[in-house]
């Protein structure tokens, strides 16, 4: 069972380190731990409120545990991972955007899949939908008449999101509290600001929240 380096003596039930919606194939070197908070009952309750789930796939590489050692984080080389975004997911994103709803990613792996599937050169599928991609963002891909999420079959990504990066698809994120100097910390600091993330972590420490894989989660809006 693939475990992060800070878990060296786990003797619990392997099923406790697996999401309820995981595929049976063994491709990933780590579990998408934000999803460990979800049970079938919780997902049913969320859907009863009107939310819809759509599944993406990303084969997490072992380098997900590798910390950013460079003094200049822009020099860090991101590992390559394989991912899949189906037509069903693309349609779900379009529907959510068209109806004015948020696309909420569960975990950083879902973020990397969805944002990797955004093609800045793709023709606009629906101006009303694509305009939502850049709402409140500086680059505004839709103003050029292009930019859309597209189907990705068996694709690869080295997407490295860090402060200053633009999110095109994801509006909000459910994620755990991450290890310092990790690419995951960079990713969440790109969706919020670094100061907001540091404030959230300080509050979590004060309230004695649990960190890392089996820890608590945060919602970034």
Regions found by a protein language model. Give the residues of each.
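Surface-exposed, charge/polar-rich loops and edge strands
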Residues: 1-221
């Amino acid at each position: 069972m693939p475990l992060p380096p800070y878990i060296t003596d786990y003797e619990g039930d392997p099923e406790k380190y697996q999401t309820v919606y995981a595929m049976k194939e063994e491709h990933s070197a780590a579990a998408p731990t934000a999803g460990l908070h979800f049970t079938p009952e919780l997902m049913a309750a969320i859907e009863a409120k009107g939310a819809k789930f759509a599944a993406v796939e990303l084969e997490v590489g072992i380098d997900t545990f590798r910390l950013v050692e460079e003094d200049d984080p822009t020099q860090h080389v991101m590992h390559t991972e394989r991912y899949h975004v189906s037509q069903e997911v693309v349609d779900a994103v379009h529907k959510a955007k068209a109806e004015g709803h948020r696309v909420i990613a569960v975990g950083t792996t879902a973020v990397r899949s969805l944002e990797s599937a955004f093609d800045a050169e793709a023709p606009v599928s629906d101006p009303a939908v694509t305009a939502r991609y850049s709402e409140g963002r500086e680059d505004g891909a839709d103003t050029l008449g292009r930019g859309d999420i597209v189907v990705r079959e068996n694709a690869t990504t080295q997407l490295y999101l860090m402060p200053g990066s633009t999110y095109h698809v994801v509006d909000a994120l459910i994620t755990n509290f991450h290890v310092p100097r990790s690419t995951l910390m960079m990713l969440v600091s790109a969706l919020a600001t670094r100061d907001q993330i540091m404030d959230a972590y300080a509050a979590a420490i004060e309230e004695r929240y649990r960190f890392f894989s089996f820890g608590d989660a945060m919602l970034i809006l």
